[in-house]
Amino acid sequence: MFNIPAVAVSYLIGSLSFAVIVSKYYGMDDPRTYGSGNPGATNVLRSGKKKAAALTLLGDAAKGLVAVLLARVLQEPLGLSDSAIAAVALAALVGHMWPVFFGFKGGKGVATALGVLLALSPATALVCALIWLVMAFGFKVSSLAALVATTAAPLAALFFMPHTSWIFATLAIAILVLLRHKSNILNLIKGKESKIGEKR
């Protein structure tokens, strides 16, 4: 009965674009109008405002965490199925990528995906975060780190997630994040991808 409303609420939470919200708070340009045009922490960092970028990262991750954690806490009282939790997880990411509050022009979903994974399986999230950190510090390319960590997510989920529907949700999340990085993949192939903090 509450499965569909739970998914809808998760989508709305995911639709809160912290890159845009934080930028407006600090009187900065809309991140969709400069750099890569992506409303995410990496692009906000290109503005030179490290605090704004950090808040964007935390906000985007937190909304994924809160959306799924809220559903998990209320799972028994509301009679939500495990499949509904999986759908809630996916909906939070879809909201971030296609936010109803911001003209359906959202980000690439890396931070939000991490928050979602943290709520579903802390171990899976930890594996992905460690991979991202190693790649980011090693190569200084955020998109490369994100792509490798994203690819590893479904594999880690196979070992750490208790429900098949959650594993499939993680796979779907990984596919969406990879698809949103199509331009980054092409730039990596051409050797034109910018490094962390580098202005375009």
UniProtKB/Swiss-Prot annotation:
Reaction equation(s) it catalyzes: an acyl phosphate + sn-glycerol 3-phosphate = a 1-acyl-sn-glycero-3-phosphate + phosphate
The organism of origin for this protein: Neisseria gonorrhoeae (strain ATCC 700825 / FA 1090)
EC number per UniProt: 2.3.1.275
BP terms from Gene Ontology: phospholipid biosynthetic process
Record key words, sorted: Cell inner membrane, Cell membrane, Lipid biosynthesis, Lipid metabolism, Membrane, Phospholipid biosynthesis, Phospholipid metabolism, Transferase, Transmembrane, Transmembrane helix
Keyword Lipid biosynthesis appears in the UniProt entry: yes
Domain of life the protein comes from: Bacteria
Family per similarity comment: Belongs to the PlsY family.
Subunit structure, as described in the record: Probably interacts with PlsX.
Function: Catalyzes the transfer of an acyl group from acyl-phosphate (acyl-PO(4)) to glycerol-3-phosphate (G3P) to form lysophosphatidic acid (LPA). This enzyme utilizes acyl-phosphate as fatty acyl donor, but not acyl-CoA or acyl-ACP.
Gene from which this protein is expressed: plsY
Protein name, UniProt field: Glycerol-3-phosphate acyltransferase
Enzyme class: transferase
Annotated TM spans: 2-22, 51-71, 84-104, 114-134, 158-178
Molecular function via GO: acyl-phosphate glycerol-3-phosphate acyltransferase activity
HAMAP family for this protein: PlsY (MF_01043)
Record pathway: Lipid metabolism; phospholipid metabolism
One term under GO cellular component: plasma membrane
Bilayer topology: Multi-pass membrane protein
A matching Pfam family: G3P_acyltransf
Subcellular location: Cell inner membrane
